Amino acid sequence: MFKSGFVAILGRPNVGKSTFLNHVMGQKIAIMSDKAQTTRNKIMGIYTTETEQIVFIDTPGIHKPKTALGDFMVESAYSTLREVETVLFMVPADEKRGKGDDMIIERLKAAKIPVILVINKIDKVHPDQLLEQIDDFRSQMDFKEVVPISALEGNNVPNLIKLLTDNLEEGFQYFPEDHPERFLVSEMVREKVLHLTQQEVPH
């Protein structure tokens, strides 16, 4: 039996969504920069084995929009919820819950789909601080699961993938391969530009 499904990764800017996706896929498919909102596209990372396929949809970092483009990007991120079976809501272990997190939580409650809370950057905090973070977020919403990880180091990422695959429904293989190499190269070039230039780069 082959299992498949779509999974969205939501979270505030720079919480490690792209780092997680890149670790899972083993290649750089989402640009990483210290500028917020640098992941423009619903970049799909496709995790495929002989028995399952997870199609990851990475969203623009959700923020309080200050421009029409920013507003479009936020709504684009939320529109993803209509296309997936499960949401990974990613938050950083080393930052307290903020207004941006609360805004996302309210949207997720309204969406009424399974949400897994992924607490990233656990390598940066003491276990006691991690437990406080888990309790705080659990007090706000009933999550299907809570999974602490370090996307950068890969800690507990395999367990998260297993959790996702265990909950997939029977289905077919949506995609035979990942994004075209041309797309990957163009995104890597744009990342270099963002890192090297001190001027305003459209992003």
Swiss-Prot record:
It is found in: Cytoplasm; Cell membrane. Residues 120-123 are annotated as: G4. GO terms for cellular component: cytosol; plasma membrane. Keywords: Cell membrane, Cytoplasm, GTP-binding, Membrane, Nucleotide-binding, Ribosome biogenesis. GO terms for molecular function: GTP binding; ribosomal small subunit binding; rRNA binding. GO terms for biological process: ribosomal small subunit assembly. It is a peripheral membrane protein. Residues 11-18 are annotated as: G1. NCBIfam families: era, PRK00089.1, small_GTP. An essential GTPase that binds both GDP and GTP, with rapid nucleotide exchange. Plays a role in 16S rRNA processing and 30S ribosomal subunit biogenesis and possibly also in cell cycle regulation and energy metabolism. Belongs to the TRAFAC class TrmE-Era-EngA-EngB-Septin-like GTPase superfamily. Era GTPase family. This is GTPase Era. It comes from Streptococcus pyogenes serotype M49.
